[in-house]
Amino acid sequence: ITITAFWCGWTGPVVWNFYEGQETLGLVPTAYRHQRMNEILAGAKFAKSLGVNTVVTHVGFLPENPYDPHYPALLVCLRKIAETLSADGQDFLFETGQETPVTLLRTIEDIGCDNVGVNLDTANVILYGKANPVDALDVFGKYVRGVHCKDGFYPTNGRELGREVKIGSGKANLREVIRKLHK
């Protein structure tokens, strides 16, 4: 068995919805950013000790507006993680979900490090109502370095995520995702 990636979590409150999730998930919330950055860097060292060169995490609800006053400081944090991992020969991947494909693309471009990419969670883009995975590949496909296959349905209210379901019974269209990844 080959471990291809290490998913690195973080401490503090975590709420997986559209309201509290904005304030609790990933590196976006300023109240938890520094601590979580250090936890991700420690997790990356642990991954390296296991021989794993890819670190994945949810960064959180990236600002859609590039002029959001919190965006520059978030980029500094993400660039520090990317540069630290690069020095150790590791890649840093965004687990998809809370962000639109174009916002994720812009953020990767703005970080400007060659070791930054995408771990495509085929259900999360649906569960958060941000995209379908087939079309998302048109936007950030060249950055996909890992895939986390799941399936699900879009949200049916404005507060809670969509519903995750058994692979093949939701909207992910995994056959087309895989076909497109192999193009």
Predicted features, each with a name:
Residues 1, 35, 174:
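Aromatic- and glycine-enriched glycan-recognition loops and surfaces
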